[in-house]
Amino acid sequence: MSTRDLVLVALFAAIIVALGLIPPVNLGFIPVPVHAQSLGVMLAGVVLGAKRGTLTVALFMLLAAIGLPVLSGGRGGLGVFMAPPSGYLYGYIVAAFVTGYMSERLVTARQTGLVQGSYFFVAAVAGGVFACHLCGVLWLAFVTGLGLPAAFMGTLAFVPGDVLKALIAAFAGRAVMVGYPLLPQRA
């Protein structure tokens, strides 16, 4: 891994942390807050690709695990990894990988801007929405005993916001591809 890769991983981990400063919103009917950090996970996958995006999220999770208050709401420490919303945190790693992998495979420099943006959006939805929510629902059902149908129904409230975040990530991925073409997509 080059110095450039390390800097990009650290930069995007810092972006995820910064997005955690936006106060989370609790909906009340499910014990999972709505926050902006999942946007950072999608951005890491879309912009950095599978390897560096996954390493970015792994670094972010390590910072949270050692107790730094990097999660939304100023949370950190090993205890947050056992709480009901922890499945979504585990899903961040899967989300970054899936988003990055699909972005690397679907998006090429020869495509038109609309096609690139559409593929970035598909990748962000597949990783940042489907993969992350799958991990979150499975963990939520396991920890709370809700059962899969109830956990799934509870997570549906978050899907529209996450689709909006995927759209933002797609626009950002397209902008980076146009504005900074020297950033290698594959590492």
What label would you give each PLM region?
Residues 53-60, 68, 99, 136, ...:
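Alpha-helical transmembrane segments and their lipid-water interface positions
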Residues 68-74, 138-153:
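Interfacial helix-loop-helix junctions of multi-pass membrane proteins
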Residues 6-11, 35, 39-43, 54-59, ...:
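Hydrophobic alpha-helical transmembrane segments
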